[in-house]
């Protein structure tokens, strides 16, 4: 059985369980172990696909088309394992599975209850996601004490009883607040959080103590004494300047050794080589250049809605030792034709979104970038905005629009995808009356790049795969008309039915590119992504007056 590390949180939410778990996973991976991660979310939605970005942040998409929590994005940025729908489990999905089994008669007339049926289904999902790995980390969403989390906590308690301490570890992330008026760190919240956890039968093996500053040894000893945790296993997690430095911090405190010792993996695990993370941190701390990118979006008041976009831009910068400053611009604010927010920036990125609010602002941002020759990168809705702008103002298609926003448009250059082929070869069909949840073109889709284009140059190969999440697409009825007006169809689906990327000829614009997919989901700090690296390079060139000041790379 795969050794499991269960990660819980206490005192308050948003302490960074996902980052801490992913950082530990990256160290174990660096020691030669095959690692995976799972997120257990206590909300009743089947998945986050229909949840408001203002409440939940971005919806992260995996290769197999699962719409998941943004924590899976953190996981994939820290470890090289590609995750799937099995790695994201919600209360809604658990209950849906159990109810389907009950309707089929799988329980043979039994009264279906939280224990054992719900907890058994949770355990089954954990086993399914973690089989065949050397180690798996399982994060339980929410905070200990929340009523929604109780079935998950009961399930992992049962796992510990069944597998024992050599195959399970409980890691609890808690807060050690600093009270400025008293000039002291307070350990009482941590003690109470562990007490709450122990009341439901779970004794932590490791405590990760979040704090604003380094926790003195005397306080660590106190925490260990009153929580029944070894002093060695009380790990301080102070605020750090660089998020991607967390693996180095946890390694410095020997957290991976605690895991190796408890699971008796010393014969399997090699010494950790964290040189890649050292390079990443060094590039972030010591940039040689700096650019400012305007992100024109609909949900900029809650930047977690664009978490992967922001991270991918930073990755693109650190691969060339460039600090990327993000200027968040509300798309609606541009609809009065005041482009002041886009002045003195080095590049414009228009990310994805849904609905008509702010769409005209995105179209205007595309037009501004095109006419002012500012590097432009459109993603999903950002590509659709660029197509609408080009159709209206270059191709002369007055009233061009997306049918998502105007079903009576005389020139619907963007329209609902009614049929497409999945990666398994099955044909999917949709119409305007289809459910919203799980009905989009989702997951990794291959596309063929056109020879001689900017995207072909950036990727360096003819066929690439990118993750998608969209319901509307470039209308093929206008393909020839827009190409005749100068628009370049830079990539198409493998069956030639869907337009995947567009760009402008380089004699018309130095760097204008847009894609229907979401390349931000495949960007990592150690590797970056060709499109984001190219975009930041173009922004550097604009800042330098058309010529790069210095070629640098990590």
Curated annotation (Swiss-Prot):
Stated name of the protein? CTP synthase
Q: Write out the catalysed reaction.
A: UTP + L-glutamine + ATP + H2O = CTP + L-glutamate + ADP + phosphate + 2 H(+); L-glutamine + H2O = L-glutamate + NH4(+); UTP + NH4(+) + ATP = CTP + ADP + phosphate + 2 H(+)
Q: What gene is behind this protein? A: pyrG
Binding residue positions for ATP: 14-19, 71
User: Main role?
Assistant: Catalyzes the ATP-dependent amination of UTP to CTP with either L-glutamine or ammonia as the source of nitrogen. Regulates intracellular CTP levels through interactions with the four ribonucleotide triphosphates.
Tell me if Cell division is a UniProt keyword of this record.
no
Q: Quote the record's binding site residues for Mg(2+).
A: 71, 139
Q: What else is known?
A: CTPSs have evolved a hybrid strategy for distinguishing between UTP and CTP. The overlapping regions of the product feedback inhibitory and substrate sites recognize a common feature in both compounds, the triphosphate moiety. To differentiate isosteric substrate and product pyrimidine rings, an additional pocket far from the expected kinase/ligase catalytic site, specifically recognizes the cytosine and ribose portions of the product inhibitor.
Subunit annotation: Homotetramer.
Q: What family, per the record?
A: Belongs to the CTP synthase family.
Q: Give start and end of each Glutamine amidotransferase type-1 domain.
A: 292-545
**Record InterPro entries:** Class_I_gatase-like, CTP_synthase, CTP_synthase_N, GATASE, GATase1_CTP_Synthase, P-loop_NTPase
The answer to whether the entry has keyword Metal-binding is yes
